[in-house]
């Protein structure tokens, strides 16, 4: 695979290899055949980051080869959304001959939605001033004249200039209901929107008929907690990143959801609060004991669950675990399988043509 060519003819074979690999990894814990969710074969990534290479009068996007570290020129990127591809061409055309915008520009980040909105961030090794803002506004207006619904941001050391806003609003059809998700620049969002829809619908399916409340750790912008709210009496969710919490609060209001409570704290801190080890001012006014959480949802970072959180989640009758790293999932399952068994197993092909796998398991108490 090269950045400008996807081996789409190999899609089925690479997916089949992942299924075999996941089954092999899960064999000590389950003999289930994974439910398999396929990605679009191209234009599936909704965000991308590129370094910018200056070559005389020319400049262009590059990425670095992971093995050789050599740079690779990228003029089109079929893994990314069609909107990102349009913007890549338009941004280079708009910046190449503009001394103010191109000087010391070293990176461009793209974030797009299925609803055809975009935030483009230009990163600089220089101070950004009013002259930069004026030129950036002219570029933004020229892009919009090409029917590109785009917001531009300039970034430099300790500086962030938003010309309009630093977010876009995604609209996803999830099990017959449109969900609105505010996505903030430089915050985590699911990279493959089509796969995200399938993950949300799978999570809804496996929690059908749930009793009581849901507790979610690492909730981000509320991606899962808001979609799952319809299956539970109440949802209590934690997240540490301030921009994600603010986006989650917006998303609760935008989706007219009244049974979700977001708390800004780390999963480790919340574990201490639940176990009565520490009290936190942030929890004043929230009666943790009033929640009857029969199900806990975790979507941890690549490192998986720490040992304290492992112990905490074992107290819940049902554990829904979305993993972006099956190796750490299996490490967690060495502990979790002592008290719980795997009821459902899914493979989500979030990153086609790479070795990365995303998977989901539903665990129920033995």
Curated annotation (Swiss-Prot):
Signal sequence span is: none
A GO MF label: tRNA (uracil(54)-C5)-methyltransferase activity, S-adenosyl methionine-dependent
Q: What induces it?
A: Growth rate-dependent regulation of transcription. Is a novel example of a mRNA regulated through a mechanism similar to that of a stable RNA (rRNA).
What InterPro entries does the database record attribute to this sequence?
MeTrfase_TrmA_AS, MeTrfase_TrmA_CS, SAM-dependent_MTases_sf, TrmA_MeTrfase, U5_MeTrfase_fam
- Record-level GO BP terms: tRNA folding; tRNA methylation
EC numbers for this chain? 2.1.1.-, 2.1.1.35
Phenotype when the gene is knocked out: Cells lacking this gene exhibit a lack of m5U modification in tmRNA.
- Location of site Interaction with RNA? 190, 299, 302
Keyword annotations: Methyltransferase, S-adenosyl-L-methionine, Transferase, tRNA processing
Question: Which cysteines are cross-linked by disulfides?
Answer: none
Active-site residues, Swiss-Prot/TrEMBL: 324 (nucleophile), 358 (proton acceptor)
Report the enzyme's class at the first EC level. Answer: transferase
The entry's cellular-component GO terms read: cytosol
Give residues annotated as binding S-adenosyl-L-methionine: 190, 218, 223, 239, 299
Q: Which Gene3D superfamilies match?
A: 2.40.50.1070, Vaccinia Virus protein VP39
**Swiss-Prot/TrEMBL catalytic activity:** uridine(54) in tRNA + S-adenosyl-L-methionine = 5-methyluridine(54) in tRNA + S-adenosyl-L-homocysteine + H(+); uridine(341) in tmRNA + S-adenosyl-L-methionine = 5-methyluridine(341) in tmRNA + S-adenosyl-L-homocysteine + H(+)
Role noted for this protein: Dual-specificity methyltransferase that catalyzes the formation of 5-methyluridine at position 54 (m5U54) in all tRNAs, and that of position 341 (m5U341) in tmRNA (transfer-mRNA).
Q: Which family does it belong to?
A: Belongs to the class I-like SAM-binding methyltransferase superfamily. RNA M5U methyltransferase family. TrmA subfamily.
Protein's recorded name: tRNA/tmRNA (uracil-C(5))-methyltransferase
Q: Which organism is it from?
A: Escherichia coli (strain K12)
């Amino acid at each position: 695979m090269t950045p400008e060519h996807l081996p789409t003819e190999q899609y089925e074979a690479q997916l089949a290899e992942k299924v075999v690999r996941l089954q092999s990894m899960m064999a000590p814990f389950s003999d289930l055949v994974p439910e398999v969710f396929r990605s679009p074969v191209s234009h599936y990534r909704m965000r991308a980051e590129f370094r910018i290479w200056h070559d005389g009068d020319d400049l262009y996007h590059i990425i670095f080869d992971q093995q050789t570290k050599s740079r690779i020129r990228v003029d089109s990127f079929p893994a990314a959304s069609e909107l990102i591809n349009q913007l890549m061409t338009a941004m280079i055309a708009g910046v190449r001959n503009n001394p103010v915008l191109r000087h010391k520009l070293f990176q461009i980040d793209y974030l797009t939605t299925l609803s055809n909105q975009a935030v483009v961030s230009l990163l600089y090794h220089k101070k950004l001033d009013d002259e930069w803002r004026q030129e950036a506004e002219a570029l933004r207006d020229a892009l919009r004249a090409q029917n590109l619904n785009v917001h531009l941001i300039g970034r430099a050391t300790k500086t962030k200039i938003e010309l309009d806003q630093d977010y876009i609003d995604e609209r996803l059809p999830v099990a017959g209901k449109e969900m609105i998700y505010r996505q903030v620049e430089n915050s985590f969002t699911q990279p493959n929107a089509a796969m995200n829809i399938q993950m949300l619908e799978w999570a809804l399916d496996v929690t059908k008929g749930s009793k009581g409340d849901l507790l979610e750790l690492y909730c981000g912008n509320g991606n899962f907690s808001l979609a799952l709210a319809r299956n539970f009496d109440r949802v209590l969710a934690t997240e540490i990143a301030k921009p994600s919490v603010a986006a989650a609060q917006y998303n609760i209001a935008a989706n007219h959801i009244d049974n979700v409570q977001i708390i800004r704290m780390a999963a480790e801190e919340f574990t201490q609060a639940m176990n009565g080890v520490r009290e936190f001012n942030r929890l004043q006014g929230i009666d943790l004991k009033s929640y009857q959480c029969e199900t806990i949802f975790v979507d941890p970072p690549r490192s998986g669950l720490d040992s304290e959180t492992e112990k905490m989640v074992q107290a819940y009758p049902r554990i829904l675990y979305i993993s972006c790293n099956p190796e750490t999932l299996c490490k967690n399952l060495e502990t979790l399988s002592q008290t719980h068994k795997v009821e459902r197993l899914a493979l989500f092909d979030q990153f086609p043509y790479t070795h990365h796998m995303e998977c989901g398991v539903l665990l129920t108490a033995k």
